[in-house]
Every structure is written in structure tokens, then in C-alpha cells.
Amino acid sequence: GQLGKGVETVDFDRRTVPSRGREATRIDAAHDGYASRFGLTHQRILTLSGDGTELAGEDILVPSSKNGKRGKIAFALRFHLGRGVEVQLSGDKRGASLLLPDGRLWQFRLGGDRGGAGEITLSAEDSLWVDGDGRPHATEQLVIEGLALRSGGQFSWLFRKTG
């Protein structure tokens, strides 16, 4: 395959880490696909609990050069959901309930913004999933949107199985 346009470097690391007295799997990944246009590198840290009931994530936008736009930079982080997942946004627009077709319930929650980007919002938008035969199927996606400063930003989130 080929990396997306503008991506020159991708870093990836996977390891087992302690988490609440148990082992968890942590993945650190980064790419420079936004460096030439926005002057930012995107890093994502994922930590999956040993029992698979929590996925904690952190998206970090790090200044990579003096290139890129001045002022605040709009961003959108997208989480494409599987077929048949029903989404109900919370009243504060910082969380969502995800009802799976088999009846299991997951919660999604935004954490704090430690990068000074200001208000970040969560919404649900239409999306598509293409099956193995090339047929598209309507799905939904969760979208985190906000403005990052040129100095970067740090945004945490959590998926948790609740039922």
C-alpha cells in the first residue's frame, strides 16, 4: 500500500503496561501527514484494558516546524462506528451512549483539553462502511471538533463497556 498524501513518517510502538493493578496494552502511533500544511504532527496513544472493557485514548497535536497556518487550526477527530450501532449524544455534548446490535452498551466520553485549544465538541454524523463485496452500508461516526493553537493541543477520550 501507499501512505496518504503528505505522509512521510509513521511511528508505532506496542507494549504491555500496568493499569489499575492489571496489565493493559498500550499503542503509541504518530504521523507527519499534517506537517507541511499545518505544521503539526499527530500522535495517538491508545490503552486497552486487559479485559477489553475500556479503551482510553489521547490525541496530541505537536508543533513540527514553523510551517503551517497562523493562529488557531480547526481539527476533526473521527471514530467510524460499525453497522447497526445506535448513537445517543449526552446533553452536554461531551459524551455518547452506543447501543450495539447485540444489545451491549458502550459509553464514549471526552476528557479534558490540556492543550489550551478551548472548547471541543462531540457530534454524530452519517458515515459509510464498505463490505468485502464493495457494497456501501450507512453507518454513523462520532466527531470531535475544535480549534488547536499553533503550539499544539492534547485531547483525551474514553470508550467504556457499561452493559
What are these regions (language model features)?
Residues 1-163:
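CBM-like, beta-strand-rich accessory domains located in the C-terminal region of large
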